[in-house]
Amino acid sequence: MRTRVRPLDDDDLPDTLALLSAHPVENLFFLDRIQQGGLKRSRLGCPVYGAFRHDDLVGLVHVGSNLVPVADDEEVLAALAARVGPWRTSTSIMGTQRAVLPFHEHLTHLSERAWGHPRAKRTDQPLLVIDAPPAITPDPRVRIVGFEDFESYFRAAVDMYTEEVGVSPLDPSNGYRRHMLAMMQRGDTFGILDEHRIVRWKSDVALSWGGVCQIQGVWLDPALRGQRLSAPAMAGV
C-alpha cells in the first residue's frame, strides 16, 4: 500500500492529536510540543512530517534537535526516514523501541556516515508509570524551587546532565540555562535544599499534557546516595 509523506500544519492538528492521544504516555514529548506550538513550523521551530495512506494519518516524525518517530509499520517508518534523508541535523533519536530501532536502521541505510555511529544506544530504557498515590510516605522537605535559588538548582541540573549523558550541557548560547529558567518560570522545578540553601535533590516536570506529566532530571547529591532518600523525595513531587 502506497505511503505518502508531507509536512504537517495546523490544519492537521485534529488527526495528529487523535493519533498521539491514543497512547499519551509514550507520546508525551510530541503532545507537549504541539500543545505549546501547534504544527506550524515557524512557531514550533522545526518541521513535523506525517505519513498518510489514502487520507489517513498513520505515522509522524518530529525533526528537531530530537528526532521522534511515531509509527508501528515498517513501511511507514521507512517512508518517514526517507523524508528525513541522509543529512543529519538532529542530536538524538527518541521514542518507543519499536519505532526508534527500525527507524535508525533505515536512516543508517541512507547514510552510514551520518547515522551509523551513534555515541550511545539505549535500547532497553523502561518507561515507568504511576497512576495512583505513592505507596510510601513523601519527604516533606520537597518543594517548588524558585528563582532565588536558581544558581544552586542550575549547578545540580548541570551535574545531573553531565553524569547521565556524559557531556556537559553548557554551551556559548546558554541554551540549557534558558531551558531551566523557563521550567522554573512554569513552577516545574522541585527540590530539597539544606540549611545553607544548597540543592541536595532535584527533579523537573519536563513535559505535560492533559492529566499526564513526565518527571525527569532526577538527581541526588553524591554524598547522600545509598541512604534511600530518592524514593520518598520522588513521592513528594
Which residues are covered by each model-predicted region?
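Short amphipathic alpha-helix that is part of the acyltransferase structural core
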Residues: 1-30, 133-170
